[in-house]
Amino acid sequence: MKWIIQEEKEEDHLQILNKDSEIGIDEVGRGSVFGPVFSVAVVLSKKSGLTLKKLGVNDSKKLTPKKRKDFFPKIIALSSDYALGQSSVREIDLLGIRHATELSMIRAVKKLKHMPSELLIDGPLTLRLWEGNQRNIISGDSKFISIATASIIAKVMRDSLMERLESKYPGYFIFKNKGYGTKQHFSSLKKHGLTNLHRKSFLNKLNLI
């Protein structure tokens, strides 16, 4: 296994951009206290990447929820391939969030039609179970369009799940907090107790259970 963790140098950035396509991967929900962690891998040709950049696609954290939803079908249409992987709350509690996040990323990559020779991963999390090359890029979602699009798809898909779960788990304001530990969410936990989708390992550390 080969990996590089780095602040991407300009010459490396240009080298990747000169390739015919790039495969980016990002996760969402790692810091949540409720629900699974999602990871998405996206394969983008150089041409599609340039088209999406011209449309204004950027790091999902810099976009409004409406913008992310607007970009979602465009990204799906222009990507050569994409795949979602996830790890359940049970896996997060049993394995720990680091291992569970890695597992969700591996699952996403394994669902791609063709195994990539190199992955561009947002942040420092190395995939120990991945045999190919990988580049771990700090703030990768603001530097590489494939990572940015993976971030958007993952965010839209997980947010959609959280909104659907609101009716099944009322009183926790999941549609609003998307499973993250807001003051309102913690207050609801004290009032209603835990559900089967709350991460006990996280809440234990916060002394909330």
UniProtKB/Swiss-Prot annotation:
Q: What is this protein called?
A: Ribonuclease HII
Compartment(s) where it occurs, according to its Swiss-Prot or TrEMBL record: Cytoplasm
What gene is it encoded by?
Answer: rnhB
Gene3D superfamilies hit by this protein: Ribonuclease H-like superfamily/Ribonuclease H
Q: Which organism is it from?
A: Prochlorococcus marinus subsp. pastoris (strain CCMP1986 / NIES-2087 / MED4)
Q: Which reaction does it catalyse?
A: Endonucleolytic cleavage to 5'-phosphomonoester
What is the role of the protein in this entry? Answer: Endonuclease that specifically degrades the RNA of RNA-DNA hybrids.
> Which stretches make up the RNase H type-2 domain?
20-209
Q: Which GO terms describe its molecular function?
A: manganese ion binding; RNA binding; RNA-DNA hybrid ribonuclease activity
Assigned protein family: Belongs to the RNase HII family.
Instruction: Please name the InterPro entries in this protein's record.
Output: RNase_HII (IPR022898), RNase_HII/HIII (IPR001352), RNase_HII/HIII_dom (IPR024567), RNaseH-like_sf (IPR012337), RNaseH_sf (IPR036397)
Enzyme category, top tier = hydrolase
Q: What is its EC number?
A: 3.1.26.4
Q: How is the cofactor bound?
A: Manganese or magnesium. Binds 1 divalent metal ion per monomer in the absence of substrate. May bind a second metal ion after substrate binding.
Query: Which keywords annotate this record?
Result: Cytoplasm, Endonuclease, Hydrolase, Manganese, Metal-binding, Nuclease
Query: Would you name any one GO CC term?
Result: cytoplasm
Q: What is the lineage of its organism?
A: Bacteria, Bacillati, Cyanobacteriota, Cyanophyceae, Synechococcales
Which residues hold a divalent metal cation?
D26, E27, D122
Q: Which cofactors must be present for this protein to function? A: Mn(2+); Mg(2+)
Q: Which GO terms describe its biological process?
A: DNA replication, removal of RNA primer; mismatch repair
Q: Which Pfam families match?
A: RNase_HII
Supply the HAMAP family for this chain.
RNase_HII_B
